[in-house]
Swiss-Prot record:
Pfam families associated with the record: p450
Domain of life: Eukaryota
Protein name per its UniProtKB record: Cytochrome P450 monooxygenase fsdH
Function text: Cytochrome P450 monooxygenase; part of the gene cluster that mediates the biosynthesis of fusaridione A, a bright yellow trans-fused decalin-containing tetramic acid with antimicrobial activity. The PKS module of fsdS catalyzes the formation of the polyketide unit which is then conjugated to L-tyrosine by the condensation domain of the fsdS NRPS module. Activity of the Dieckmann cyclase domain (RED) results in release of the intermediate fusaridione A. The unstable pyrrolidinedione ring of fusaridione A is opened through a reverse-Dieckmann reaction to afford its ring-opened form.
EC number per UniProt: 1.-.-.-
Cofactor list: heme
Organism: Fusarium heterosporum
């Protein structure tokens, strides 16, 4: 059948349209390819200029990647499951190089335990790095808190929180003692073996929530707030899993239990934020009315808690909640990790336990410790430092370069020259391996030996709480709470014996802890302290682990000996 004029025209139009579409697509492909080639050439020459300007040399050491680096990923997964991931990283640094490059799936990362490199990342080149995927992974729980923000937003959070760690606001020692007493009650009197791990976590949860919220979860006693405690633990588990996936975290399936846990935690914090804002409103009203008494809520509660002090600085509900949960993460897990590792180590070293007990008894004679006495316990502090060295609570950290930048070590034949870190490349520094370098800490760097701290001071070789502008705000809180627990345990128990025949094994999440728990047998001494009268006493944390001058006019109240 003959085609009509209309059908001829339609066929011609479709042929022309197809030709035009093909021409457009071809042109677009050529433009994109040309742009990519020109961009690559431009990047090549600009990086050559950058390398020459900074004297960078090719990196000296590389991980032996195979199958596009899949062997590295498989090895990391295998050693993590075997609970020896950190030891495997330490082996890499000792045998490949203290700074080396890893190539996997088309990406390049730099791994380092060189103090000068870590110092550069955390100080002089601080603005060249971001947190990578941390905000996206941790955001569902922590929102826009201090641990998940960069730049001006982070600076604002830091400035908001810093005043609340002033010396006279850090902790009420009677509060720590009260929760410690609940912990001691959970330890059997008959000398039976016990795993202290969960008890320590409950203790730090209870003390941290009272310090931050103004009200404890009391998980060691009533367990009324166990839902929040369990939800918080599961939220941290979910975050840890997401961070381990790195850039592939986006492809994991949503965990409904994690979503529910995040919601429970945020709603729990919201209740206390609202109370703090009510305190703020009453405070402003009392100032306007010229009142001299502290404002109160709930029928007369006028305590000055951490959250209330924070609420006096801002009335942003989300900000208060996000910062509160961020600090709880640090206060609960970091301190629990340190206390657990310390007691695990001392249980394996009875001679060290005896030295701690002797030092404390010679000083206290059955009294509760004063702040000045805590400052002067040399051997006890050596033990705390040694636990931090061997088992830093946060053993691994990473930053992502947001522009081409430089590390001062790792290039050239000897690895002593600068190297370039390209934009978007991760830099991973492993504090766990840094603290076990034989050239820095001796041939016995893998051993628990507190005496190494007698005549030795370290700077960027010892980083249990990070360094630079992002150094942990609450490090003195964690250190003093740990030291106080050690002193009180030494007063309470004459012996601590390890019931775990195996060496320390890692359990790696956001923090690291003993994978087999803290299984010990404790023998109570003939006497404890002469009394527990620490009511209403404040402790000054400033300078506990480093000599400092007391600043006049700070309002710091020293604690006195607590006798009955």
């Amino acid at each position: 059948m003959a085609l009509t004029v209309f059908e001829h025209a339609s066929a011609l139009w479709y042929r022309l349209q197809g030709s035009v579409s093909l021409a457009v697509l071809s042109t677009l492909a050529v433009v994109i390819a040309g742009w990519y080639i020109l961009s690559s050439i431009s990047l090549y020459f600009s990086r050559r200029q950058f390398i020459a300007l900074h004297g960078c040399k090719p990196i000296a050491n590389r991980y032996p990647s195979k199958w596009f680096g899949i062997n590295f990923i498989l090895e990391a997964g295998r050693t993590y499951k075997e609970r020896r991931y950190l030891d495997a990283l330490t082996w890499n640094f000792r045998n490949i190089g203290y700074t080396h490059e890893v190539r996997a799936l088309g990406g390049t990362s730099v791994w380092t335990v060189e103090p000068e490199n870590i110092k550069a990342v955390l100080t002089s080149k601080f603005k060249d790095y971001s947190l990578g995927n941390r905000p996206a992974v941790m955001g569902p729980l922590l929102g826009r808190g201090v641990f998940v923000t960069d730049g001006e937003e982070w600076s604002h959070s830091r400035a908001l929180l810093r005043p609340n760690f002033a010396k006279d606001q850090v902790a009420d020692l009677s509060m720590i003692e009260r929760h410690l007493q609940q912990l001691l009650k959970m330890i059997p009197d008959d000398g039976k073996a016990i795993d202290l791990n969960d008890l320590i976590l409950s203790f730090t949860m209870d003390s941290s929530t009272e310090f931050l919220f103004g009200e404890s979860t009391e998980t060691l006693t009533s367990g009324i707030n166990r839902q929040f405690s369990d939800a918080f633990a599961y939220s941290l588990h979910d975050i840890s899993s997401g961070l381990r996936l790195g850039p592939w975290y986006k492809f994991r399936r949503t965990d409904p239990k994690a979503v529910q846990s995040h919601r429970i935690c945020r709603e729990y914090a919201d209740k206390y934020v609202e109370k703090a804002l009510e305190y703020r409103r009453n405070y402003i009203k009392s100032v306007e009315d010229g009142a001299t008494d502290k404002p109160s809520i709930d029928g007369g509660d006028s305590r000055r808690t951490f959250l209330r002090e924070l609420a006096l600085a801002t009335d942003d509900r989300e900000k208060l909640r996000d910062e509160l949960l961020s600090l709880l993460l640090a206060g609960r897990d970091t301190t629990a990790s340190l206390i657990g590792s310390l007691l695990f180590s001392l249980a394996k070293k009875p001679e060290c336990w005896e030295k701690v007990r002797s030092e404390i008894e010679e000083t206290l004679h059955g009294d509760l410790p004063s702040y000045e006495q805590l400052r002067n316990f040399k051997y006890a502090k050596y033990c705390v430092n040694e636990a931090l060295r061997l088992y830093p609570p946060v053993p691994n950290n990473a930053k992502i370069a947001i522009r081409d930048t430089v590390l001062p070590r790792g290039g050239g034949p000897e690895g002593r020259d600068p190297i370039i870190v390209p934009k978007d490349a991760p830099v991973i520094y492993t504090v766990y391996a840094l603290h076990r370098r034989y050239d820095l800490f001796g041939d016995d760097a893998d051993d628990f030996r507190p005496e190494r701290w007698e005549n030795q001071r370290y700077t960027w070789e010892f980083l249990p709480f990070n360094g630079g502008p992002r150094i942990c705000l609450g490090q003195q809180y964690a250190l003093v709470e740990t030291l106080y627990v050690l002193v009180r345990f030494a007063q309470h128990f004459s012996k601590i014996e390890s019931m775990d025949p195996e060496p320390w094994t890692e359990s790696l999440a956001l923090t690291v802890s003993s994978g087999n728990g803290v299984k010990v047998k404790l023998e109570r001494g003939s006497s404890d302290v002469h009394g527990l009268s620490t009511q209403g006493v404040l402790i000054d944390y400033g300078g506990l682990f480093a000599p400092t001058q007391k600043v006049p006019g700070t309002g710091v109240t020293q604690i006195s000996k607590g006798k009955a």
